[in-house]
From Swiss-Prot:
Protein name according to UniProt: Calcitonin receptor
Signal peptide: 1-29
Record's subunit section: Heterodimer of CALCR and RAMP1, RAMP2 or RAMP3; the receptor complexes function as AMYR1, AMYR2 and AMYR3 receptors, respectively, and respond to amylin/IAPP, calcitonin/CT and CGRP1 ligands. Interacts with GPRASP2.
Lineage: Eukaryota, Metazoa, Chordata, Craniata, Vertebrata
Gene name of the encoded protein: CALCR
Family, as annotated: Belongs to the G-protein coupled receptor 2 family.
Length: 498
C-alpha cells in the first residue's frame, strides 16, 4: 500500500477538477499532447512523457535490426508509448501508460501494422493512429467511485471527531471525579497504571481528532479547488505539512500504546508506573524530524503545487518511519497474544473458550495498534477486487477513530460502570435534595400555624423557643444532602478500591 491516502487525494483532485479525460483517445508520432496550462498537471504529465520518450529512443538505438521475414512496421514512438518492430498484419498491444490518474494502467492500448508494412492511419487525419480508447473508457465509473470515497472520507472523519470528542470528555469527567477504576485486573493491577493508560488513550484520541480535522479541511478546501492549487499559495503547503505531521503523530501514538502494553504484559506484569514523558517525546516530538526533513527536501528538490504529487520517493522520509512503527506494533501484537494464550493455558480453561478469548484480544488490539495496514498492504490488480479493497481500506482509514472510540471508551465495562456509579450518586443527591426541600416546607408550614395559634391565645413570644417535638414513630428522619453525599462517596471509594 504505497501512499494510499495521498494518492487517492491526488486522483480525486484530478477527477473533481477535470471529469473528462485529460488526454485525447489517440496518439501518433507527429502529434504533441496538449495540456491546459495548469502547472500541476502540465509539469507532472509532460515530465513523465519526456522520460518515457528518452527511454524509448535509447531502446530503439540499442535493439538489433528486425530479424524476421517479410514486411514489417518500423519501431516508433507515437507520442505516448514506444512500439517495437512489428510484422505486417499483426495487432500489437501493451499496457496503457500511467502518466495521468484517469488512464487505467491495467487496460491495454493497441496499434495495427497493415499488410503493406505501414502503421494504420486514421481515415480522418491520415496519420498513424494508436487506439487509446480503452485507457480512459472507465473514467465515469472511476469518477463515481472517487465521489463515493470522497463522501465516505467526510462522513468517516466527521463521525470520528464527534465520538472522539465525547470520549475525551468522558475521560476528563471521570478523571475529575476520580472514578475510573483499572481497565483490566490482569493488565492494570494498580490505580496509577490505569491513570497512565488513560493518559495514553487521551493523547492518541487527540491525534485522531486533529488529524481528522486537517483531512476534512484539506478535502473541502484544497481538493475541489483547482484554482487554489494553480495559484499554489504558501498556506496550501503549510496545511500539507501539518497533515503529514498529525498523520505521523497518530501512528507513533499507536506505537506508544504498543510499547506500553508490551512492557506491561511481556516485560513485567507488576511493573511500577512508567515514565510518560518518554511517550510524549516519541508521540509528539519524534514525528517533527521526518516531517520537517520532508518539507525542506520537498521545497528544494520537488516543489510541485501544494505538494500533492505522489510521484516522488521523498514521501518515504515520512512514510518510512510510519511503516516501521506499524511493523513493530505487528510484532508486539504477536508477542502479546503469545503471552495471553500462555496465561490462558495455565488457567486450565476449555480450549474453545481459550481461543475465543485470544481472538477477542486480537480484534481489540488490531485497531489500537494499526496493524490492519500491515495485513492489507497491496491493492489487487483485478477491477472488482481492487474496488472492494478500496472500500475496505478507506473505511478502516477514515473510520478508525470512530472504531477506537467505540471499543476503548463506549464499550469498556469499567467506563460504563464508573458512569453508572456517578449517575446513581447524582440521582441519590437529587432525591435527597427533594426530600430535604419537602421537609423544610412542612416545617415552615407548621411554624406558621403555631405562630397564628399563639397570637390567638396571646401566648408570650418566648414560648415559641421551646424544644422541638419528637417525630412520630412511623415517620422516617430527614437526611441532609451532605450526609448522603458523604455516605455515597464512602461506598463508592470502597467499590473502587475493591
Amino acid at each position: 500500500m504505497r501512499f494510499t491516502l495521498t494518492r487517492w487525494c491526488l486522483t480525486l483532485f484530478i477527477f473533481l477538477n477535470r471529469p473528462l479525460p485529460v488526454l485525447p483517445d489517440s496518439a501518433d508520432g507527429a502529434h504533441t499532447p496538449t495540456l491546459e496550462p495548469e502547472p500541476f498537471l502540465y509539469i507532472l504529465g509532460k515530465q513523465r512523457m519526456l522520460e518515457a520518450q528518452h527511454r524509448c529512443y535509447d531502446r530503439m538505438q540499442k535493439l538489433p535490426p528486425y530479424q524476421g521475414e517479410g514486411l514489417y512496421c518500423n519501431r516508433t514512438w507515437d507520442g505516448w508509448s514506444c512500439w517495437d518492430d512489428t510484422p505486417a498484419g499483426v495487432l500489437a498491444e501493451q499496457y496503457c501508460p500511467d502518466y495521468f490518474p484517469d488512464f487505467d494502467a491495467a487496460e491495454k492500448v493497441t496499434k495495427y501494422c497493415g499488410e503493406d508494412g505501414d502503421w494504420y492511419r486514421h481515415p480522418e487525419s491520415n496519420i498513424s493512429w494508436s487506439n487509446y480508447t480503452m485507457c480512459n473508457a472507465f473514467t465515469p465509473d472511476k469518477l463515481q467511485n472517487a465521489y463515493i470515497l470522497y463522501y465516505l472520507a467526510i462522513v468517516g472523519h466527521s463521525l470520528s471527531i464527534l465520538t472522539l470528542l465525547i470520549s475525551l470528555g468522558i475521560f476528563m469527567f471521570l478523571r475529575y471525579f476520580n472514578l475510573l477504576a483499572p481497565f483490566n485486573a490482569l493488565l492494570y493491577p494498580t490505580r496509577s497504571i490505569s491513570c497512565q493508560r488513560v493518559t495514553l488513550h487521551k493523547n492518541m484520541f487527540l491525534t485522531y481528532v486533529l488529524n481528522s480535522i486537517i483531512i476534512i479541511v484539506h478535502l473541502v478546501v484544497i481538493v475541489p479547488n483547482g484554482e487554489l492549487v494553480k495559484r499554489d499559495p504558501p498556506i496550501c503547503k503549510v496545511l500539507h505539512f501539518f497533515h503529514q505531521y498529525m498523520m505521523s503523530c497518530n501512528y507513533f501514538w499507536m506505537l506508544c500504546e504498543g510499547v506500553y502494553l508490551h512492557t506491561l504484559i511481556v516485560v513485567s506484569v507488576f511493573a511500577e508506573g512508567q515514565r510518560l514523558w518518554w511517550y510524549h517525546v516519541l508521540g509528539w516530538g519524534f514525528p517533527l524530524i521526518p516531517t520537517t526533513a520532508h518539507a525542506i527536501t520537498r521545497a528544494v528538490l520537488f516543489n510541485d503545487n501544494c505538494w500533492l504529487s505522489v510521484d516522488t520517493n521523498l514521501l518515504y522520509i515520512i512514510h518510512g518511519p510510519v511503516m516501521a512503527a506499524l511493523v513493530v506494533n505487528f510484532f508486539f501484537l504477536l508477542n502479546i497474544l503469545r503471552v495471553l494464550v500462555k496465561k490462558l493455558k495455565e488457567s486450565q480453561e476449555a480450549e474453545s473458550h481459550m481461543y475465543l478469548k485470544a481472538v477477542r484480544a486480537t480484534l481489540i488490539l488490531v485497531p489500537l495498534l494499526g496493524v490492519q495496514f500491515v495485513v492489507l498492504p497491496w491493492r489487487p490488480s483485478t477491477p472488482l477486487l481492487g474496488k472492494i479493497y478500496d472500500y475496505v481500506v478507506h473505511s478502516l482509514i477514515h473510520f478508525q477513530g470512530f472504531f477506537v472510540a467505540i471499543i476503548y471508551c463506549f464499550c469498556n465495562h469499567e467506563v460504563q460502570g464508573a458512569l453508572k456509579r456517578q449517575w446513581n450518586q447524582y440521582q441519590a443527591q437529587r432525591w435527597a435534595g427533594r426530600r430535604s426541600t419537602r421537609a423544610a416546607n412542612a416545617a415552615a408550614a407548621t411554624a406558621a400555624a403555631a405562630a397564628a395559634l399563639a397570637e390567638t391565645v396571646e401566648i408570650p413570644v418566648y414560648i415559641c423557643h421551646q424544644e422541638p417535638r419528637e417525630e412520630p414513630a412511623g415517620e422516617e428522619p430527614v437526611v441532609e444532602v451532605e450526609g448522603v453525599e458523604v455516605i455515597a462517596m464512602e461506598v463508592l471509594e470502597q467499590e473502587t478500591s475493591a
